Design a protein with these regions (language model features):
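Short linear motifs at protein or domain termini
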Residues: 1-105, 109, 217, 221-229
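Short helix-capping and inter-helix turn/linker motifs at the boundaries of alpha-helical repeat units
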Residues: 18, 116-117, 181-184
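Juxtamembrane/interface motifs at transmembrane-helix termini
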Residues: 59-60, 110-113, 137-140, 158-160, ...
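Mobile beta-alpha loop/short-helix "lid" or hinge segments that flank ligand
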Residues: 67, 71-72, 165-167, 182-184
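Alpha-helix N-cap/N′ positions at the starts of helices
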Residues: 76, 99, 121, 185-188
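Short alpha-helical transmembrane interface motifs in multi-pass membrane proteins
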Residues: 85-86, 172-176
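Conserved amphipathic alpha-helical segments that form helical-bundle/coiled-coil interaction surfaces
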Residues: 92, 109-174, 188-196, 204, ...
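Conserved G/P- and acidic residue-centered "switch" motifs that form tight phosphate/ATP-binding loops
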Residues: 201
Length: 229
């Protein structure tokens, strides 16, 4: 987000809870994208000036991020960035492999026609952009596929947890898509999951979604992509 956009945060929201949430999202994104590095000190006054807000929503956002383990509060100063470590990433993918399977299984039983059509559209567009080599678009479509599946699971808690996990490892996911042959492979895996969901085969959908995560973990390990965390 550019400075001009950040300076208008106050104009985009009308109450302190929305403002705090917006500030939280901006800072969190900068941590997860690597713009704010591990160990970097985040000063309340500097952040407030950068975002065009008072120190109060910045302080509240940093406290919320401390609860997520993304920063460590430094009294009377601000916070130190912790971010997502390589060990965190391993834990996240281990949990995702189980929860994505559960999510796909629920989706096989609960998905509606609109959601199914959306997944099919995403798979079709992904094939198109694989051929074009449009990696930014592939990353966006990968996000969309998983978000629609989370919604189709009908589980509010699964959607919340998996959406956070998906976002936490965005840097390494993007790097994984750049690795040779992975962009084509991940969509073939998506299409297999989609077919199982379409057939309402819960067990098959669970196994394929679980395997999809394990294949991603293997690719990350083979390419040494954990260094991107």
């Amino acid at each position: 987000m550019g400075k001009k956009g950040e300076s208008k945060i106050n104009q985009e929201v009308s109450d302190k809870y929305s403002l705090r949430g917006r500030v939280f999202q901006v800072i969190r994104e900068k941590i997860l994208s690597g713009e704010y590095k591990h160990g970097e000190e985040l000063k309340e006054t500097a952040l407030a000036s950068e975002l065009g807000v008072s120190r109060t929503p910045v302080r509240e956002a940093l406290r919320q991020m401390e609860l997520e383990g993304l920063v460590k509060i430094i009294p009377n100063k601000g916070a130190s960035v912790i971010g997502i470590t390589a060990e965190d990433m391993e834990d996240i993918y281990s949990m995702r492999s189980l929860l994505e399977g559960l999510c796909a299984g629920f989706a096989a039983e609960r998905i509606n026609e609109e959601q199914l059509d959306k997944l099919e559209e995403i798979a079709y567009l992904t094939d198109f952009h694989v051929k074009k080599g449009n990696l930014e678009k592939l990353y966006e479509l990968d996000n969309q596929f998983h978000e629609v599946m989370y919604e189709a699971s009908g589980s509010r808690m699964l959607k919340h947890v998996l959406s956070d996990f998906h976002h936490y490892v965005e840097r390494v996911r993007k790097a994984s898509l750049l690795s040779p042959g992975r962009s084509q492979m991940f969509n073939e895996e998506h299409k297999a999951i989609l077919e199982a969901i379409r057939e309402k085969d819960r067990g098959k959908a669970e196994r394929l979604a679980n395997a999809h995560m394990k294949n991603t973990i293997a690719n990350i390990s083979e390419q040494g992509l954990e260094k991107n965390v």
